[in-house]
Amino acid sequence: MNPSIIKQLIEAGMAGAQVEVMGDDGVHFEARVISEAFAGKLPLARHRMVYATLGDKMGGEIHALALKTLTPEEAAKAGVA
């Protein structure tokens, strides 16, 4: 598994999301996902939304995925938009 495939899967499952995925060992990854769909949702719900886009790859091809999930407004305040 490589970061670009994970990025494509998340983008396909979350229309309009801005996604950045890093990882160089093929099983451990970090992702920053910025989406308006996260508005009003707690972190756990946001993470579940992202995991849902990856299906059975989580726990299989993807051993670990550290997530940073933000709305566009939160990203702008954090200076990452």
Where are each of the predicted segments found?
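C-terminal structural segments of small proteins and small subunits
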Residues: Y51-A81
